[in-house]
């Protein structure tokens, strides 16, 4: 595995995972099974109010080729074919959705010790072309992410970022939405043994002069149980507890309250993931 600055999508990922991953207000159930031939089948269902959504995902691996096929309750078929290392540091990804004939996309990723590059293009007459790159090291890296609409003949996305890593600290600064949104994130691993960490995500929108922030923390009560909490500038406070009750099988309970409308009921989410 190549060690380097990673891809553009990796910038700020540690802070995002701490602040947003596993928080939900729905009821979700996931079960995975594995055959002796290496085929993995994952079935999941999510209850959103009175609406129930479900999907079945089948994953097949053959040497360095992985095929994922997912069918949802709307009879949509999503297929992703990933080829790992057709050349050193390269990953090729083909994805498409049936019945949408213009949903196909090809993506190439390249990881180097001092660079990470990703490029994708839609498989249609006038596709959107996306290109992102990160240049630097594990400690300091600079990145850019742009999209070009060949039909309109103009840039539809232009983002830039810088990422800094120092021991147990990770900081990132991003400029998104064509320079309108400035965001900064910070992640600090306080105690790796207990998985204790804090994170913050702050944003400023120049067009509206609006500021937002999310502050969160996590801590492992024991090797199998983790608790997390976060607050936002809008007054919403969330907490979750996640327990690995058997190897690779997780139960997660999360809640959210609006401190500015405390009379309202808290939102409760439950997630159960079963793996053999």
UniProtKB/Swiss-Prot annotation:
UniProt signal peptide: none
Protein family membership: Belongs to the eukaryotic mitochondrial porin (TC 1.B.8.1) family.
UniProt entry tagged with the keyword Ion transport: yes
Organism this protein belongs to: Pisum sativum
Domain notes: Consists mainly of membrane-spanning sided beta-sheets.
GO cellular component: mitochondrial outer membrane; plastid outer membrane; pore complex
Record localization: Plastid outer membrane
Protein name per Swiss-Prot or TrEMBL: Outer plastidial membrane protein porin
Keywords linked to the UniProt accession: Ion transport, Membrane, Plastid, Plastid outer membrane, Porin, Transmembrane, Transmembrane beta strand, Transport
Molecular function (Gene Ontology), one example: porin activity
Entry-linked InterPro entries: Porin_dom_sf (IPR023614), Porin_Euk (IPR001925), Porin_Euk/Tom40 (IPR027246)
Keyword Cell membrane among UniProt keywords: no
Domain of life where this protein originates: Eukaryota
Role summary: Forms a channel through the cell membrane that allows diffusion of small hydrophilic molecules. The channel adopts an open conformation at low or zero membrane potential and a closed conformation at potentials above 30-40 mV. The open state has a weak anion selectivity whereas the closed state is cation-selective.
């Amino acid at each position: 595995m190549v060690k380097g600055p990673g891809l553009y999508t990796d910038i700020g990922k540690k802070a995002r995972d701490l602040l947003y991953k596993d928080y939900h207000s729905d009821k979700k159930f996931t079960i995975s099974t594995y055959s002796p031939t290496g085929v993995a089948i994952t079935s999941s269902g999510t209850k959103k109010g009175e609406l129930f959504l479900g999907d079945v995902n089948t994953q097949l691996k053959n040497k360095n080729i992985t095929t994922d096929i997912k069918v949802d309750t709307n009879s949509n078929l999503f297929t992703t074919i990933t080829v790992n290392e057709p050349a050193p540091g390269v990953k090729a990804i083909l994805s498409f959705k049936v019945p949408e004939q213009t949903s196909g996309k090809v993506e190439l990723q390249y990881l180097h010790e001092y660079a990470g590059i990703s490029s994708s293009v839609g498989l249609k007459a006038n596709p959107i072309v996306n290109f992102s790159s990160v240049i630097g090291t594990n400690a300091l890296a600079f990145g850019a992410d742009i999209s070009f609409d060949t039909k309109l003949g103009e840039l539809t996305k232009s983002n830039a970022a810088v990422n800094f890593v120092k021991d147990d600290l990770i900081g990132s600064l991003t400029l998104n939405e064509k320079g309108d949104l400035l965001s900064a994130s910070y992640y600090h691993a306080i105690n790796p043994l207990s998985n204790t960490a804090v994170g913050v995500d702050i944003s400023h929108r120049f067009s509206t002069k609006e500021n937002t922030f999310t502050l969160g923390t996590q801590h492992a009560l024991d090797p199998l149980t983790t608790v997390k909490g976060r607050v936002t500038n809008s007054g919403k406070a969330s907490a979750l507890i996640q327990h690995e009750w058997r190897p690779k099988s997780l139960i997660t309970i999360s809640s959210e309250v609006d401190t500015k409308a405390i009379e309202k009921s808290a939102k409760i989410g439950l997630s159960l993931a079963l793996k053999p």
